[in-house]
Amino acid sequence: MATGTDQVVGFGLVAVSLIIFTYYTTWVILLPFIDSQHVIHKYFLPRAYAVLIPLATGLLLLLFVGLFITYVMLKSRRLTKKAQ
């Protein structure tokens, strides 16, 4: 069973994910249909960032996954050389 701290951290992660999802969905799907002079537009970044932010995040994720795989492979290779 999860401890109280685990539950709080899990709830926090779910809450942050829901906030980001709601913000991004509103930004990308609903905002284009609202008049550009409406006051709600000042709470959102320009639309170009709607593509750039997920793209940069995806590239960083791929970079870290690649670095992790490289690290594990090099570490495994060193251990097999020591064993021989």
Curated annotation (Swiss-Prot):
Keywords: Endoplasmic reticulum, Membrane, Transmembrane, Transmembrane helix. It holds the Pfam family DPM2. It is found in: Endoplasmic reticulum membrane. It comes from the Eukaryota. The keyword Ribosomal protein does not apply. Pathway: Protein modification; protein glycosylation. One of its GO terms (molecular function) is enzyme regulator activity. The keyword Secreted does not apply. One of its GO terms (biological process) is GPI anchor biosynthetic process. It is a multi-pass membrane protein. Belongs to the DPM2 family. Component of the dolichol-phosphate mannose (DPM) synthase complex composed of DPM1, DPM2 and DPM3; in the complex interacts directly with DPM3. Component of the glycosylphosphatidylinositol-N-acetylglucosaminyltransferase (GPI-GnT) complex composed at least by PIGA, PIGC, PIGH, PIGP, PIGQ, PIGY and DPM2. Interacts with PIGA, PIGC and PIGQ. This is Dolichol phosphate-mannose biosynthesis regulatory protein. The lineage of its organism: Eukaryota, Metazoa, Chordata, Craniata, Vertebrata.
